[in-house]
């Protein structure tokens, strides 16, 4: 049954330093609902109706804030300032070498131990654009030198639910100095809602993939043909 689109806000818990984390419940009024918390911009719930109208939460997550803070498996976070790994936790930009926080052996993963997925974001409902039912904007300012990255980076991330049962993420970032930026979302999906995901079929219209070496460091782009990574047609 259809209802009016809405966004509700409630307290979700407190961080060890006493700051309050809020949870935002987005409802497009047509059966699609999303839950996001201001800690890490984590999407901890996405309820989607299937073709028969049965609704299930299709993302993996915890029930309590402490699990996200203490265990930090990157479930549902905004990954940054640089998602994935940087070899040796170091890079050179405009002739200068920058040493980053190393939190994955000798490498930097998802921006370091205090990456964007561990930060408290400022969140607020914003007017929906045409085709959207509801929208939430999250803001975070990463100071110059945070986790070793140069430049002050102002980030806006927008979660919106469409009138067509779509969920869209929009990223914007502005820096005052040359820096590295690679933002993404880090949810894990099980479209069955629970149990095994081995019954899924996956289709990715990509002809190349990033080949990785020791430490899962990307080495080069390789052709998917003849590899287990060829999902150009749907595969289990």
Question: Which role does the model predict for each range below?
Answer:
Residues 2-236:
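An exposed, glycine/acidic-rich loop-and-rim segment of catalytic or binding clefts
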